């Protein structure tokens, strides 16, 4: 029996390698617009802009206190960034040697405010594509500290960086709090670590299977691990308490565990079915983020 249990552990550990590869290779989608129904005006307009005009994402660069000739040079550098289609500034309409003060007020006000000026950048890729986010990063590295990149694509890039930075932090906090709570209320301090190790391996295995979905939302990625930890930890605690009760009735620990599993099976299955049913209900939302979250969540729990 011991050799069989050890074999199962080794098999799980071996599966962690492809699971980690799958988790790393799963694309994370940060564009909430892609989950909108295709017949909404916003989506239709974006498709027309991309298909008929060859322009998808756009951003603005706000530049403070820079000489017009330096702005023109910066504009030229940005125009050579991959997937930048067009960079608009006032020198597209008037020579940069012409003082800004004598420009028509409509033209001046369109690009300037106080000592700040604005560049409008159009990309040939969609708002949240990987190519667009790489272009935003490249533009920021070129622009310098006195320049600020804004717009939806810049916000998506910031969101991506923020999520990647903070996700390990709040997952770690969830694990720490769960561990502390179990150590306080359980009579064995080793048990919480055993539970966390087992559930942690299950989470990694399930995250790897997301590769077969092609991509998942950043919200789904952020929530799925914590949800699985919370739900499956409850089932583990149910089983542990039942096992502790049965040990007082049966001398053989294996027999006590078998009885404990039988006693908790009905409640665990009933609880898991209602949980899975709730996740399946999300799949019927017209906003297909629900489908993404529901699919990942119920596959992780089943």
Range-by-range predicted roles:
Residues 1-6, 10, 300:
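Single conserved hydrophobic/aromatic residue that forms the stacking wall/gate
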Residues 8, 13-43, 47, 53-55, ...:
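Transmembrane helices with small-residue packing motifs
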Residues 22, 26, 181, 207, ...:
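Hydrophobic, glycine/alanine-rich multi-pass transmembrane helices and their short helix-loop junctions
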Residues 39, 43, 69-122, 157-161:
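Extracytoplasmic
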Residues 120-185, 211-213, 260, 267:
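Juxtamembrane "pre-transmembrane" interface segments
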Residues 227-246, 268-271, 275:
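Short helical (or helix-break) motifs at transmembrane helix termini and adjacent helical loops
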